[in-house]
Amino acid sequence: MILRVLILLAITAHPALAQNMSAEDFDRYTRGKTLFYGQNGAAYGVERYLDRRRVVWSFLDGQCNDGVWYEDNGQICFVYDNNPDPQCWTFQQGPNGLIAQFENDPTATELYEAEDIGEEMLCYGPDVGV
């Protein structure tokens, strides 16, 4: 599965001048989907988008974090149970999926949607043992 993600990331093209998505556009595009994201040709993470702007994020390590998103000053901001500091992004819809720019800063992290896999993401339970 990771190989499929990496192949899709390698062929993702950067759109010319796309317009930032509104909260309504973002919700309409993402709700009910599980999307993989990549950066610089490598898998970065996966997010499941639920009703009422709830999300579940993982860095593909089996550790999943519940959160919510909201719009603030033209950006889509995420707050997770394990991190109360908002993580704000602008999203554009390119020809091959979403493009996310951290804090709308062209020099900051940029992520590309790899695909909607149409299946559940892997989340391990809490650490248990002796």
Over which residues does each language-model region extend?
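Lipid interaction determinants
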Residues: 16-66, 72-130
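Sec-dependent signal peptide recognition
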Residues: 1-8
